[in-house]
């Protein structure tokens, strides 16, 4: 896939590892194409493992493997079904996240759960650091789960129904834009969740200023603005009150 400023085509880590071990690599442009489906059928897979794959797997492929298609999902299902479970876990201030290995069906992360592992979040957890934690935990869980699946030692568990509002929708660049009328706690979580991508930002003189780190502070032991006669806290949100070597102190909602 394209990497770097020059957008040069580079092999993915999965492809590099496969080639290092002499394993064949097949990279269809669209997995739903008849040619791709037939090529996978010829492989006669016992199991298909899907991790962060950006295409919908057709039913013809889901039904092929003896042990099914399994997905390594970066949340404790049914929480955070969808494309961006990691960022939303940080954004919502969760204390615990985790990985679920599930048997895939035609729904969006709705298949039966096979195994799970919990991963605690640090107070300064970012989207990037949690990604690394869950990647390591998921790889370990997958290696443990596959032999159990083959031996019939895994009992599939159906997922309870959840509201569609609980889905972890895809993150867009605009989700990094800071609304200073929100609370300091919400903004601090947003900044951590959006690191390293798409990154939190604000507008300064018409230009985007990326913000990588922040912490919540209480000025003068309380809400400074409630002590200023005639001060409107909402209108003053986003105003810089202190700028020194430690950074900027900005009023929030």
Which ranges hold each PLM region?
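One-carbon transfer enzymes
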Residues: 1-198
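An anion-binding loop in the catalytic cleft
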Residues: 181-253
